[in-house]
Amino acid sequence: MSIADNKKAFHDYFIEERFEAGLVLEGWEVKAIRAGRVQLKEAYVVVKNGAVYLIGCHISPLPTASTHIHPDPTRSRKLLLHAAEINKLIGKTERAGFTLVPLDMHYSKGRIKLEIGLAKGKKQHDKRAAEKDREWQREKQRLVRSAQH
């Protein structure tokens, strides 16, 4: 079940490969995510010192979060991946010109997971072509439906 989607990622990038990563979260963050108070729109993923981090993800704390700790809604959160996956990501992002983008946050066996995509940026003409293709697919569906009735 999806918690939050990053629809902008599919508009701005060609997604080549997907990885599922665990997140290192604090208690108030888990409660806020379960309440649906998370936004992936401005978020991105970086590799620093052999570890993968989610940066710019906004998790709004619940009003009941804490009285003595001031939660930081946009702190960097560590992602949990296998060493082989991290090495693969490092190789692709450094050599092949790929970037890492968060695609969606979901539950897997009761745990909160983040799906990240190995992506290549789209140029403006690619975005236009994709939009034209989507419109044509919609028009085709409309024609097929009208022909069946």
UniProtKB/Swiss-Prot annotation:
Basic and acidic residues composition-biased segments: 127-142
Subcellular location: Cytoplasm
One MF term in the entry's GO annotations: RNA binding
Annotated segments matching region Disordered: 121-149
Biological process according to GO: trans-translation
Pfam family, one: SmpB
Keyword RNA-binding carried by entry: yes
Record keywords: Cytoplasm, RNA-binding
GO cellular component term, pick one: cytosol
Principal localisation: cytoplasm
Family: Belongs to the SmpB family.
Chain's role: Required for rescue of stalled ribosomes mediated by trans-translation. Binds to transfer-messenger RNA (tmRNA), required for stable association of tmRNA with ribosomes. tmRNA and SmpB together mimic tRNA shape, replacing the anticodon stem-loop with SmpB. tmRNA is encoded by the ssrA gene; the 2 termini fold to resemble tRNA(Ala) and it encodes a 'tag peptide', a short internal open reading frame. During trans-translation Ala-aminoacylated tmRNA acts like a tRNA, entering the A-site of stalled ribosomes, displacing the stalled mRNA.
Protein name: SsrA-binding protein
Source species: Thiobacillus denitrificans (strain ATCC 25259 / T1)
